[in-house]
Amino acid sequence: MGRSGKLPSGVSAKLKRWKKGHSSDSNPATCRHRQAARSRFFSRPSGKSDLTVDAVKLHNELQSGTLSLGKSQAPETTMDQDPEVAFTEKSSGTFLSGLSDCTNVTFSKVQRFWESNSAAHKEICAVLAAVTEVIRSQGGKETETEYFAALMTTMEAVESPESLAAVAYLLNLVLKRVPSPVLMKKFSDTSKAFMDIMSAQASSGSTSALRWVLSCLAILLRKQDLEAWGYPITLQVYHGLLSFTVHAKPKIRKAAQHGVCSVLKGSDFMFGEKAPAHHPAAVSTAKFCIQEIEKSGGSKEATTTLHMLTLLKDMLPCFPEGLVKSCSETLLRVMTLNHVLVTACAMQAFHNLFHAKPSPSTLSAELNAQIVTALYDYVPSENDLQPLLAWLKVMEKAHINLVRLQRDLGLGHLARFFGTAVTCLLSPHSQVAAAATQTLKEILKECVAPHIADIGSVTSSASGPPQYITKMFRAVEEGLTYKFHAAWSSVLQLLGVFFEACGKQAHPVMKKCLQSLCDLRLSPHFPHTAALDQAVGAAVTSMGPEVVLQAVPLEIDGSEETLDFPRSWLLPVIRDHVRETRLGFFTTYFLPLATTLKRKAMDLAQAGSTVESKIYDTLQWQIWTLLPGFCTRPTDVAASFKGLARTLGTAINERPDLRVTVCQALRTLITKGCEAEADRAEVSRFAKNFLPILFNLYGQPVAAGEAAAPRRAVLETIKTYLTITEAQLVNSFLEKATEKVLDPASSDFTRLSVLDLVVALAPYSDEAAISKLYSTIRPYLESKVHGVQKKAYRVLEEVCASSQGPAARFVQSHLDDLKKTLLDSLRTTSSPAKRPRLKCLIHIVKTLSAEHEEFIAALIPEVILCTKEVSVGARKSAFTLLVEMGHAFLRFGSNQEDALQRYLVLIYPGLLGAVTTVSCSILALTHLLFEFKGLMGTSTVEQLLENVCLLLASRTRDVVKSALGFIKVAVVVMDVVHLAKHVQLVMEAIGKLSDDMRRHFRMKLRNLFIKFTRKFGFELVKGLLPAEYHKVLINIRKAETRAKKHRALSQAAVEEEEEEEEEEEPVQSKGDSIEEILADSEDEDEEEERGRGKEQRKLARQRSRAWLKEGGGDEPLNFLDPKVAHRVLATQPGPGRGKKRDHGFKLSADGRLIIREEEDGNKVEEEDGTKGEDEDMTDAMEDASVRSKKKLKRQREDEEDELEIPPRYQAGGSGIHRPVAKKAAPGAEYKAKKAKGDVKKKGRLDPYAYVPLNRSKLNRRKKVKLQGQFKGLVKATQRGSQAGHKLRRKDRRRP
């Protein structure tokens, strides 16, 4: 233990020491902040000023007028001079007056720089301010042209690099907005000034000025017309810009390359009506690139070559065909250097060329095909991961573009590529197999699928494109051989896409593959059954089940000797994938088979073979489950349905086990198979047969123990069939149903069932039938039987819900009668009927006009009371109706605020009624405040809040609960300024709550306090509440502090992980659209500055990194072999190189991440305290009334658990408050109490020390600590093992 007062070793060097005699000084040596403060109080700063001699000189010259703007400018660039003498002058001005009040929007970005500490930004601000003052002093209007003239004059006068950079930056901004005629007229003088600066600054140490001058020159060239490019001076200036694309400094080089791209792609005349196919400077640009590459192509580092390849990557699609060919030949030549980076850049250039999809004048089909053929000589090794991935991507884009240009030629090349790409599935790298699979999928979708219909039938003996398709399929089919067994999952995915793309036309050549797949599925322990089922399913979808079953018969006919059924797995596959096929095939093939199997099952059941009978019964049921798929967009409804209809009717009527399936098939056929008028008419013709059967089934009572699902399916089928049934037939059914309802002999169940049918029939009847129906059900609206009354209101609801047709016309013509009926039946409405009744009123209120305001006013008391109904549906409907009434009042009046106030006045009397009425009225006002928060006046909301605060003094819990809900919504809705006036009132009202109320609503009060403390601070809320609330407030502050700290730690952990993974993140590709090229973003500087160091480190690692793959056996490597380039690897060969990082997510078979969402995202947000305003208001509304009680209880329990605090003080910290809890050693729970060693305990795992798999331990810093702990754990185990071994040896030695 060290001596008292002695610092730990290594600390003394870090501390600042006092000089002798200054140990009592308390003021710091530096006073930077004090000086900054003094400068704000009109005193001169004592420190070094940023004002330079050049800035003073420039300011003096501008003020003295020696840099006049009109001497050498054209008339259109001069400023208008006011001949009259000005009799007013500016009373006061500062150094930056011209900046702060600059009226030109071009420099709005610069106005943000004045607060910056950067010297460059301050220089820009100073120059802009000076130039603006000069323009104003000469009577200018601060146009872009005037700024251009002033800045050009200033550029010739400045001397320091900082001022030159500032002027160039401002010119870069203003040049984009200067009219093109001005720039064309002043091209000679302006370009000469730029070229002089470029030549002077070319070897300068500073890069800023040169970068912005290069950007200005590019903008100037872009604005020239086509005629100007015919002059030698224009090309000479352009070549000056082009020469900087190989500059040694990256920022300058990048600015020049960006400028060249913007000139070739974005010149103004390239977007005109008579735009040339290629820019006039494209030829010289291509020749320059080729010349530079050939000049430096043989050097070791190939730096210039890389620079030119970077430029070519963007420029290649802009060249004419001849130059594209020359450039491509140059690219292919430099790829023979086997330089890793050069090859990668060349591949990027080819990728961009094909991805741009240029016109045939740039890339013809023949040249595209020649490049594709040449790239086969540069296939990387299968062990070379990144180059092989790049090669596959380039070939994918090349073939897609080739097929776009010439279909037959492209398909001819695809056959060879498929053979090469399939061999990539043998690569030891899973990424290569996944990339090859994805590449072939894209080619099938982009190149084959769109053209397969034009190609026609594909057979083995065909020639031309069908032959190419056959070769491609054979290459993929070869993947089913055993040598590809590790990649069978990828092969099956490819086969599925192939079936989907070409199955309809190419099924003759695919039948053998289907047989192979079925045989493969029967092989023992086959691991990819799901992928195989998907592939066969794709074949079923595209070819149809008829073709698939011809290739692989089902082999089930009811006469089997064994019960193996090896191909029964086809039935679920067909069920899940069959669609758009012949419905007649089900009638002719599957229906007889199902009948045979059912008869076989019945025979076996009679013979006592129960198990065999069940198997055949299951098979026939599986066959029937295929029917909904066959009814999904069938191709022969008109021809086949009549042969199937009788069987379906019989099955519905006599086969309860098939009822749900057949009803589903009918619904699917009507909704998805009757789009054609002929098909619709054919199915509608059988409505008179199906609907009576369905009516009868629905009218039958459910037997004890049976499920209600078949009955619901029957009713849904009735509703669906009625959509295509003729109105005359519907009227006849409705008349019969009405008679059944009125029949005194009908039982209650029958009457309720028939009323359900009437509900379904009503919307499809004509107006006369609906009128008659209304007269029939009107007495039932006041029925004593609650179920009948509810059904009657349901009928009325369906009629009122129709927005058009006979039902809508009936509502309009009988509106007064409906209003009277609904008002008269108000007192006799039972609780179960409230929901349909309220829905009727919702539909009616939507159609009302201003003269019906009294009707709405009469409904309000009932609707308010319904907000406390037992049924959640009734409560929701009541709130919806309240909102609709509000919208109705808004329709009635011109002034929305007054109209809403008139509506609220009708609700206010409820606040003076009985307890239930008061509670319901507060709930209604809460909901209206939430819905119409933007339309209610501030005074209205404040008045409501004051009245609700008075109601907090109520002794009834319901009233207090509703009042607290209102306050919670008001806190979220109201502006903080207006809410602040009433904080004291709210807090006083809450403070006067009784102990019982405070205890009962503790969680609601806690939530309110949290919201108030977040808005107004802890001290204010604490000062307004009595002492008994202070403990709760302190707990809230602690919980908020903990939550904030937890969020900060989580954020820090995330940032730390991102920093560690930064090096492995892929570089985001820059956009290559013309808009992005022309947007000269200043943000690129900072990004480039950050990324440059990382890129240099990466280049240093990758430069000259290559490996040679030795020859087989003892044979030496032959360097004269033309294919020796394939043995130059960019990746170190051999497995096990490097470690795979675990990113916390599972990977699928093709390498994609499997990310599962959290089960309850809202709960996470609540724990973090980051809920938005919308979520707060929604929670407040749900908390007010609409949520179910079970959900509220569960949330309350969660909140109480979350907000629970430790009951007593726990030691911690440092010194005497060090942590007292000892950390349990791994495996301590298995240690024996009396003897040595471990013991196995009941209900636990074996006695080992288990190391938890914690993802956070993958952190580089924490990993070392874990390794040390693990080593200690292993050593302890070894010591225990040795001790046990010695004891056993002693025991053996004893006699």
From Swiss-Prot:
Compositional bias annotation for Acidic residues: 1054-1066, 1074-1088, 1173-1182
Biased composition (Basic residues): 1285-1295
Protein name: RRP12-like protein
Region of interest (Disordered), residue spans: 1-47, 1047-1241, 1273-1295
Keyword Manganese: no
Positions with biased composition (Basic and acidic residues): 1089-1098, 1153-1172, 1230-1240
Modified residues (Phosphothreonine): T77, T88
One Pfam family from the record: RRP12_HEAT
Transmembrane parts of this sequence: 904-924
Keyword field: Isopeptide bond, Membrane, Nucleus, Phosphoprotein, Transmembrane, Transmembrane helix, Ubl conjugation
InterPro entries assigned: ARM-like, ARM-type_fold, RRP12, RRP12-like_dom
Paired cysteines (S-S): none
Phosphoserine: residues carrying this PTM: S49, S72, S97, S1050, S1073, S1081
Gene: Rrp12
Alphabetized PANTHER family for the sequence: ARM REPEAT SUPERFAMILY PROTEIN
